Structure formats: C-alpha cells, structure tokens
Amino acid sequence: MITLKTKVFSAIGDLCGDVIYGTPGDFTTPEKIVWRESRNRRYAQADGREHLAELNYTLDIFARSPEAAGELFARADENMAQAGFRRENAEELIEKDSGVHHISARYRALSDAQGNTYQ
C-alpha cells in the first residue's frame, strides 16, 4: 500500500510543539495539529500491482485565538503545497464549549510507490 505519512509529518512536524497523528487528546498546549490519512485509494494498477494511489490527509489545527490558528494554518498550508499536496478544502469550525479555534483542512495527492506526487 502506498502512503505518504512520512512526507506529511516532515512537512508539519516542527510547526508547533504538539503535532499528533490520530486523535487530539487534551488541549493543554496553546497550539496543536492533529492529522490523519483520511483516504487511501488505489488509483491505477497494472499486473495486479498498485502503481498510483489517491491519498487524502486531514489536518486539524487548534489554537487559543483565531489569529494564532490562521497563522499556524498558513504555515502548514505552505509546507503541504511545497511537499506536493493540493488543498481541497479548509474551513473554520466553531468550538464554543472549549473556546478553542479550529481550522480543518484536507489535502490530496496522487503518488507512486517511490513517493513521487502528482496533481
């Protein structure tokens, strides 16, 4: 199975002190990125082997203010674009109970087994 998890983590892993794969846990840190591979679909095959995969990654960005969330999103978005991913969607979500500002963004790329990305 083709995946680009290492490439995604390299793009976002040092943007803030709390970058997590999977679920967010608590909100004790002022900024947090939670990410996951949200789709992995065989896009092309030959001789029974996968040659291209369509990969989608979701980044959820949490911060204590809308400005901090926007700034962290802008840096993550730039890094993901440089890594070969195309942003498909980004939206601000309201977290009224916690007071945390949340931006959810989805990125897409086609990849071969060598990690080359295509749009």
Feature locations, PLM:
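Short, solvent-exposed beta-strand/turn "edge" segments of beta-rich domains on protein surfaces
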Residues: 46-51, 96-98
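Mid-chain, well-packed structural core segment of small domains
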Residues: 53-85
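Acidic-leaning, charged glycine-interspersed low-complexity segments
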Residues: 74-119
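Residue-level signal for secondary-structure boundary sites
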Residues: 43, 67-69, 113-115
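Oligomerization/assembly interface segments of phage tail-like spikes and tubes
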Residues: 51-64, 101-112
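Contiguous hydrophobic segments
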Residues: 1-6, 54-57, 118-119
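Short, surface-exposed, polar/charged, turn-prone segments marking secondary-structure boundaries
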Residues: 47-50, 61-65, 86-90, 115-117
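Small/polar-rich, solvent-exposed N-terminal microdomains that initiate assembly or binding
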Residues: 1-46, 72
